[in-house]
Amino acid sequence: MLQSLAGSSCVRLVERHRSAWCFGFLVLGYLLYLVFGAVVFSSVELPYEDLLRQELRKLKRRFLEEHECLSEPQLEQFLGRVLEASNYGVSVLSNASGNWNWDFTSALFFASTVLSTTGYGHTVPLSDGGKAFCIIYSVIGIPFTLLFLTAVVQRVTVHVTRRPVLYFHIRWGFSKQVVAIVHAVLLGFVTVSCFFFIPAAVFSVLEDDWNFLESFYFCFISLSTIGLGDYVPGEGYNQKFRELYKIGITCYLLLGLIAMLVVLETFCELHELKKFRKMFYVKKDKDEDQVHIMEHDQLSFSSITEQAAGLKEEQKQNEPFVASQSPPYEDGSANH
């Protein structure tokens, strides 16, 4: 009997602190995922780094042997200056010095990468004034960009996600959850095709040194705002229509980021994912826990603004696709 009482008390203890246990496992899983990534990257990339270091040492030794009039400290000083300039986007190579980094189109591309926090790092401000302006520009521009993306994604989601799902639910009587899942998968497939596969094929043709994998890698690194900077389009020697090309890339990155956020918002609104997310939230038991800045169920871009604002109030009996927090849609909008 004591064992049964102890077992039941343990079960009650686990159930009472279920959210804390789930959160603990979430933190542990994230840390393990970080360690897993570090182990894989280290095991894959470290041998290549070692080979490259050996190759550079051999080239340096051979160069000094062929040019005995040049001392090693002089060569080190020259290479250090070249590498320092390269870090600022200026190359000493004759076939790479024809493109300016701070003409208008290049500056426009740089501004877009700063505001979207992609930041390839291939071009950086050279002057103290440019660095100071970059700080001020980013402090104002990044929140402005978040507000802009929030408004755009909210409006696009209404027309691209909620109204189509509501249309099939009301007009054809399909289950809303099933329609939402199918719609999210189709939307993800279309987005990947239009903003990853097709642009990757285009970049592999326009960029001389890029294959399809490298082009796809650039698209993913850019639209996920990782922006490593190892691949930057439009930097080739004598790039044709470089100004127009840079403007097109800027538009592609902006539209692609919006598309990615719309897909993310669509998946976040799925009922199953909402239930899964709530497993890691703090359970609101007390009245003071109810007062907070952001609702737990509103960790998405479209939740910052009102959902589907301006729709008629007499259609409240039509349940929206998201949750009860979003105002219902018009019947007329679903029949378009």
Swiss-Prot record:
Keyword Nucleotidyltransferase included in the entry's annotation: no
Site entry: Important for increased permeability to Na(+) when K(+) levels are subphysiological: 118
Subcellular location per the Swiss-Prot or TrEMBL entry: Cell membrane; Recycling endosome; Apical cell membrane; Cytoplasmic vesicle
Residue ranges annotated as Extracellular topological domain: 42-103, 123-132, 203-211, 232-243
Free-text activity regulation comment from the record: Inhibited by 100 uM quinine. Slightly inhibited by Ba(+). Activity is first increased and then decreased when the extracellular pH is lowered to 6.0.
Tissue: Detected in brain and in kidney cortex and medulla, especially at the renal brush border membranes of the proximal convoluted tubules, in distal tubules and on intercalated cells of the collecting duct. Detected in cerebellum granule neurons. Detected in astrocytes in hippocampus stratum radiatum. Highly expressed in the stria vascularis in the cochlea. Detected in neurons in Scarpa's ganglion in the inner ear, at nerve terminals in the crista ampullaris, in supporting cells and dark cells, but not in hair cells (at protein level).
Protein name: Potassium channel subfamily K member 1
Gene name of this polypeptide: Kcnk1
